[in-house]
Amino acid sequence: MNQTNFGFKKIKANEKQSLVNSVFSNVADKYDLMNDLMSFGMHRLWKDEFIRQIPNLNSNILDVASGSGDIALKLAKKAKDRGSNISLTLSDINEEMLRQAKKKSIDLNLFQNLKFTVASAEELPFPDNSFDYYTIAFGIRNVPDINKALKEAYRVLKPMGKFICLEFSKVKESLLQDFYKFYSFNVIPKIGKIITGNKEAYDYLVESIDLFPSQDEFRIMIKEAGFEEINYKNLSGGIVAIHSAYKL
């Protein structure tokens, strides 16, 4: 029987998605606040750097695992300020998270040109060769079958389309690595319990980060999905990395 990890726990592969859904449904209303607290606001700078990887906003963009919509709404605002003709599709398997994204888009008056689709990253309901860019930020490690999700990304991108992924990675500097591990396993779950009442959700978060492949290992996975011109850029000493590749 196929098994996979849910954090450090071994579970049946077909159980992971429902468990991940439960995690994010339980913390959806405090998700943005927790991101600020856990990263000391750094996630905003990481995401700003991430969207700089999309120079042409006159594009059809798919944002997968959109969550509360941070990436898509940053792109929508940038496009609105520039007068660009952007088309943005926000996709997430968790309906409650997409509900948060919709609410934010209305509050910020950025809902124009946005589409919202509840869908799995492993089975996207879009035709082949549909999008100029595929973005996914802090989401791919939560997908039960990452290789399948990467192949779906390749399928829905147009020829010359760009895949861009922002994800937690492996810290390179030993002193920072020691602090980061201590902070992740001893502090973040406690903050999560105080703010959301759900320590287990943040135990899963830090465990899933620890298990995610290294920069070079993930690069190989991207290549095996069919992508070329694969690169990554470490941010904050490798706490996170931006991975990019093209469908040629």
Curated annotation (Swiss-Prot):
Hydrolase is among the record's keywords: no
Listed pathway(s): Quinol/quinone metabolism; menaquinone biosynthesis; menaquinol from 1,4-dihydroxy-2-naphthoate: step 2/2; Cofactor biosynthesis; ubiquinone biosynthesis
EC id: 2.1.1.163, 2.1.1.201
GO biological process, one term: menaquinone biosynthetic process
Residues where S-adenosyl-L-methionine binds: S68, D92
Keywords linked to the UniProt accession: Menaquinone biosynthesis, Methyltransferase, S-adenosyl-L-methionine, Transferase, Ubiquinone biosynthesis
Protein purpose: Methyltransferase required for the conversion of demethylmenaquinol (DMKH2) to menaquinol (MKH2) and the conversion of 2-polyprenyl-6-methoxy-1,4-benzoquinol (DDMQH2) to 2-polyprenyl-3-methyl-6-methoxy-1,4-benzoquinol (DMQH2).
UniProt name for this protein: Ubiquinone/menaquinone biosynthesis C-methyltransferase UbiE
Record lineage: Bacteria, Pseudomonadati, Pseudomonadota, Alphaproteobacteria, Rickettsiales
Gene this protein is translated from: ubiE
